[in-house]
Amino acid sequence: RLTVALNLNNLLLHPFRLSADTFSLGCGIAATLMAGLIYLCVKYSKHRLMPQKEYGSARWGGPEDIAPFLDEDVQNNLPLTASESLSLSPKMKVTANDNYNRNKNVIVFGPSGSGKSYSVAGPQLLQFNSNYVLSDPKGELLQEYGNVLLSQGYKVKVFNLKDRDKSDHYNLFAYIKNEDDILVVTKNLVKNLKEDPTAKSTADPIWEEGMTALLEALIGYVFYELEPEERNMNSVMTLLLMLESQGDGPNSVSQLDLLFDDLSINKPNSFAAKQYKLYKMAPGKTAQSINVSLGLRMSAFNIPSIANICADDTIDLRELGSEKKVALFVVTPDTTTAYNFLAAVMFQQCFQILVDIADHRPDKRLPRHLRFLLDEFPNIGMIPDFQILISTIRSRDIACTLIYQSLNQLKSQYKDDWATIYENCDSMIVLGAGGNPENLEFFSKALGKATIEVMNTSENKGSQGSYTKSYQALGRELMTPEEIRTMPRNWCLLMISGVAPFYSRKYNLKDHPNYHLVEAEGGKPFDYDRRAEQSFADFISDVKDVKTVKLCAENNN
């Protein structure tokens, strides 16, 4: 015992001295085994503890979460809320822990009066950091911001289906290059000329397929066989009226039949002739029904004002993909959807043209960021294959701000493809959700669940009274559906892919650094005379530049 006591005393006096005696070796081995056992218990324990995250780890984002997504140049940001923005830079910071690149597509939900134009479209326009294509129900955005953009050197184009006498002219044939384009335009027209473009047809598919083949033949004939000045939808309507048969018998022929018979003989490989043969495969009575149906759907082109603005092209959509500052307003009436098919065709051709321009540049990107600000997006009809377009435009420096009143509008417009469109928007703003339980539940689940502590108390009032208090971890939605429904009107939700969601104030347009321009220029009727003067000045400048180039070339020679 005395020896053990002396060894222990010596160990305490010199704890770090190495010793080879039995006692020291035994203690070392025991300590090593104990440490190993503890390590193995921790490593292979079946309990995977996540303190404060047992039922969910959702939390609200703060300044530190949005900071990596901001541009040092505030003018190069895309405003989302009063406190959050997103840099338009195509190359954001990439670290070992995260990649801060996000696509610039934004989807916005907000019922009428929630500030979709005031808090989203307006602030994004006033950045003046992009070229813009805007859907503009009623023309309110044109009146508010048209003169403002002019004052900042923008070339402002207007396709006005409401006040057509004030509209630039748009000829869809000006943007057709080949058979591929004919197929795309025809598909769009047939789809959007229906009473409800989003409805699934229950009729025999031969009707729609027959109309498609006939319209492809007519557009193909006009594009390939007529002179450039005759290539427009007015010529298509002229050909369509030639379908009237010269007799009532089963073997009766129309003037159009004779026209395409000659084309088949002279150009047997003609695209138009082949499509016409496909159409003629329909039985006589079926073909007559197809003729009448297509004629009725295309009747808008018989209206003189529509025929006039579609006869030639002054709008030049290709300029949107240039280095110039350009904005296009597509104004549609809010009392009828009869002319929205033209807007749908224009938007689709815009996407195709801009992608093509980008693809032919060395860096495969447009020289200026281009933003589609699509207010009341469902009102412009349905763009076929939009779910593909929105997933491919990012690399060309093109992006969309899609504005809906509700989630149901998106689901109704694109049915089976709505989720693809939603998932290709890395930013979502909820300005309000109305009272639809389905919408409220969707947004609540998108925010996620957090883990909270609930305090339980109990009190015993017997002869020996006692009071106990305990805490229990529970899961709770970051915001319940009811909390989203009763969210104050000046607050909104922002969700950016891969980042904690934000509960923020909506952007107050009056706080924008460029709002003084709206006070000076906004709210007045768009100044078409001022635009004409500006266009003339630009033309003279371009002529001078051309002359300068020619003179330099002559001097060099």
Model-derived regions, located:
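Basic- and hydrophobic-enriched, low-structure N-terminal and domain-boundary segments
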Residues: 1-114, 118-123, 165, 460, ...
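Intrinsically disordered, low-complexity regions
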Residues: 27, 57, 62-63, 248-250, ...
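A short glycine-/small-residue-rich loop at the edge of a beta-strand within enzyme catalytic domains
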Residues: 72-76, 341, 377, 434
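Conserved ATP-driven motor cores of ASCE-family P-loop NTPases powering translocation/secretion/packaging/pilus
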Residues: 390-493
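P-loop NTPase motor domains
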Residues: 102-398, 413-414, 423, 482-506, ...
